[in-house]
């Protein structure tokens, strides 16, 4: 049963591709205001779960509820309008568009005037609306400290900055819940520290609930309120970072028989 304090609930979610079951009867809930991390080895089903939440995949079994309402009939665009934003493991920016224009794309579903009416009535409401959207985009640019590249083509930026631009575009949707798929993958230590700070600020200053997939266990343990562990499409553990850290099943899933404890791996980081 859905409750008001839970922004997202998953009940027995399963998805199968041919003979491969990517998710098997996964249930969990995310409370409003949490940073909820999903971890697990490669191929565990983490991105498949985000794809089910965002609407890219339809579960073959089970239900998803967002703010108490079933997502069964909701398209990707419907979910964006409801307040679900998303970044991707592989960057999906428009390389030849400026940083500012890439972020503006995230506000498309919030615009009352389409392109044609905007051209016909530019001097009226459409112009004012455009200015308001640009003001909000500029606020996001300031928040993520990318003012110095706002007019640069996104494709010319270093990888770490492009990841920030994609996060900015997800924020531009004005989501209540934001899904982050490996936001720190491929980054150096300094870039990871910056991105971790932005995720914390996104949660604490902007009040966004975050569901995050991340392989850097040090970051996960530092900034998460709750952690769920998947392995071969099944949930093997869920709890606070400390509870997950102490779980024997988690150590086996990550490290296998006879390897060093997960605690030692984290200390080494």
Task: Name each region found by the language model.
Residues 2-269:
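Glycine-rich phosphate-binding loops of nucleotide-dependent enzymes
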């Amino acid at each position: 049963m859905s409750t008001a304090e839970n922004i997202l609930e998953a009940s027995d979610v399963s998805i199968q591709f041919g003979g491969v079951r990517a998710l098997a009867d996964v249930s969990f809930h995310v409370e409003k205001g949490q940073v909820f991390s999903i971890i697990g080895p490669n191929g565990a089903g983490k991105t498949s779960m985000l794809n089910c939440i965002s609407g890219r995949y339809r579960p073959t079994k089970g239900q998803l509820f967002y703010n108490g309402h079933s997502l069964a009939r909701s398209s990707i665009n419907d979910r964006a309008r409801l307040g679900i934003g998303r970044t991707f493991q592989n960057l999906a920016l428009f390389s030849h568009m400026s940083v500012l224009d890439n972020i503006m794309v995230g506000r498309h579903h919030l615009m009352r005037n389409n392109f044609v009416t905007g051209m016909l009535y530019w001097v009226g409401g459409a112009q004012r609306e455009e200015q308001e959207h640009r003001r909000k985009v500029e606020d996001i640019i300031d928040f993520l400290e990318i003012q110095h590249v706002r007019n640069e083509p996104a494709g010319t930026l270093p990888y770490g900055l492009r990841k920030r631009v994609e996060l900015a575009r997800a924020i531009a949707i004005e989501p209540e819940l934001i899904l982050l798929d490996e936001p720190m993958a491929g980054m150096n230590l300094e870039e990871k520290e910056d991105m971790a700070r932005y995720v914390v600020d996104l949660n604490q200053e902007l009040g966004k609930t975050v569901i995050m997939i991340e392989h850097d266990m040090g970051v996960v343990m530092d900034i998460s309120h709750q952690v769920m562990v998947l392995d071969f499409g099944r949930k093997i553990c869920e709890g606070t970072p400390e509870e997950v850290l102490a779980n024997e099943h988690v150590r086996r899933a990550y490290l296998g028989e006879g390897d060093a404890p997960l605690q030692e791996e984290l200390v080494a980081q």
